[in-house]
Amino acid sequence: METIKKNEVKTGKVIDLTHEGHGVVKVDRYPIFIPNALIDEEIKFKLIKVKKNFAIGKLIEVISESDDRVTPPCIYYAKCGGCQLQHMTYRAQLDMKREQVVNLFHRKGPFENTVIKETIGMVNPWRYRNKSQIPVGQSNSNQVIMGFYRQRSHDIIDMDSCLIQDRQHQEVMNRVKYWLNELNISIYNEKTKTGLIRHLVVRTGYHTDEMMVIFVTNGATFKQSELLVNKLKKEFPNITSIKQNINNSHSNVIMGRQSMTLYGKDKIEDQLSEVTYHISDLSFYQINSSQTEKLYQQALNYAQLTGKEIVLDTYCGIGTIGLYMAPLAKHVYGVEVVPQAIKDAEDNATKNQLKNTTFECGKAEDVILTWKSQGIKPDVVMVDPPRKGCDETFLTTLLKLNPKRIVYISCNPSTQQRDAQILAEQYELVEITPVDMFPQTTHIETVALFVRKEEE
């Protein structure tokens, strides 16, 4: 094998992309991963890390460009870790995401006949984030800086704009940055664990334009909060809620458990289809509202509701998808382990006069067995777990329920594929549709249809 040494400069042809969007060059079957390189490009790169089974390279020059290469429009792209694919055409991004799902499902497990649809993309894949979580820090000259983290670090890149955030969010960020400097408000220092302001979080209702601004603080005392509230109210009239979230933990967790309202309402509203949702500072709510409607519509297509079906919504959160389906179902039962989320789901059901819904707090595997003992037999089960996927106990319990259809939404196709192998005991994985919830990044969301085998 050809010798591979750190700091050596080499040339090669990119033959593949990793799930992180890095180009793959091979030297005698030894893989070298190079960020920002594209398939079929001839490149020059420097080896910056060499391990036994792989190496990492830094792109120096593109000798022969791919047709899929574009100039990243963001001036911070080379430094910031928020986006990974701005150097790639949007069509190529969608194709890459579908190909990753194909590789996961067609090459492992009994899923070679599963149909994998084209990725559902956006017409305009920018400015889509309805929630911005912006770290706050200080420069060496003690000026307030706000932006996003450098790749693989907690160094904040001071930014004036971000092309995937709502435009209003960057306007709020820039004004708050100015006011924090002007009022000389102390900023949290991650190393010394001292200072007050840790993060600025901004949420916007996509269809309502209501805005919530949250100051995440290291402790409850916030003496100049009234000054900031008055400035925000005056400059941004669509702000309907300003909150303080207290996080005095010495961890990377952004939000604490305790919040207080400094101005306006406790929650903002947004709509999906005909359903209105109340969203608090701590609520889980999909980041990309326009794509969420496409995701949920695809899930609804898979559910094939006629008005006669019992639907079970597991990992239901604030009831987002269950309430979306309720107008077309006989009854929706939702279960979630977070008590506040269940309260929000019940409030959202009441707000929308959806009386054919029942929500209960607890572990899904426990609650659905209780419902089973009460004679509740779901026709369709919705599954939308966190990135780690489903607990095996939950999946085996789900198999006991034996619904006709399972619609599984995932933000991590790797764990979805793992879970699918357990469900394959009784279910056929018929079809998967990738939905691009996070353009310019490597994140993939999928919705999958499982049908009980005896129904084929």
Swiss-Prot record:
- Residues recorded as binding S-adenosyl-L-methionine, renumbered to this chain, are 286, 315, 336, 384
- What is the recorded name of this protein? Uncharacterized RNA methyltransferase SE_1582
Span of domain TRAM: 3-61
Q: What is its EC number?
A: 2.1.1.-
State the active site: 411 (nucleophile)
Which InterPro entries does the UniProt record give?
MeTrfase_TrmA_AS, MeTrfase_TrmA_CS, NA-bd_OB-fold, SAM-dependent_MTases_sf, TRAM_dom, U5_MeTrfase_fam
Keyword set, alphabetical order: 4Fe-4S, Iron, Iron-sulfur, Metal-binding, Methyltransferase, S-adenosyl-L-methionine, Transferase
Task: Identify which top EC class this enzyme belongs to.
Answer: transferase
Gene3D superfamilies registered for this protein in UniProt: 2.40.50.1070, Nucleic acid-binding proteins, Vaccinia Virus protein VP39
Pfam families per record: tRNA_U5-meth_tr
> Native species of this protein?
Staphylococcus epidermidis (strain ATCC 12228 / FDA PCI 1200)
